[in-house]
Amino acid sequence: MNHPRGERVIDGTFYKRARVEGNELGYNTIAAAGAHACVLHWIRNDGPALSGDLLLLDAGVEVESHYTADITRTIPINGKFTKAQREIYEIVLAAQQAGIDAVKPGAKYRDINNACMKVLAKGLEKLGVLTVSAEQSLNPEVGIHRRWSVHASGHMLGIDVHDCAKARGEQYLDGELAVGHVLTVEPGLYIQPDDLLFPEEYRGIGIRIEDD
């Protein structure tokens, strides 16, 4: 694209489709190109979209019933991943699949996040950036992998994008999934542009993959 305000072009294009196909945007669109993808809720959407960078698009359409979708895709703007981009993408994709596999009636909600985090930690260990083993990092008192994965791997979804977000932990995180529950699975890895623990070619890569 190489547009000086490519993020705004993408934002506006999605808004038009949301209004034509549905009722409204479900929430403020995140159209984050390049290192902006490392900012979790980048909604300024005023940066360029340059060849060689990734675009993280987190967007959803609210339908006439006022229920909303919440989907995230991370794609290479020029259609081709660099080696570093692909390595991070494949870790996140594998983590998301592990989380999806954990979604079933009777499972605890927190099982989804735990499944995702296990894959993310092992992926970071394989890249050689963890200062401890993946198993040690997964200890809640250690959590070194959380430096690059700074949010939970999903949430309940409904009329509110983050439905039941104010619920008590024992009812939400420790609650059991049941038929009819709707939720997202959205692991992510974010390597800040100044993160010296990663080689230079990885810095500024932010990837999240989300499905409902």
Descriptions of predicted regions:
Residues 1-212:
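Active-site neighborhoods and metal-handling regions in enzymes and metal-associated proteins
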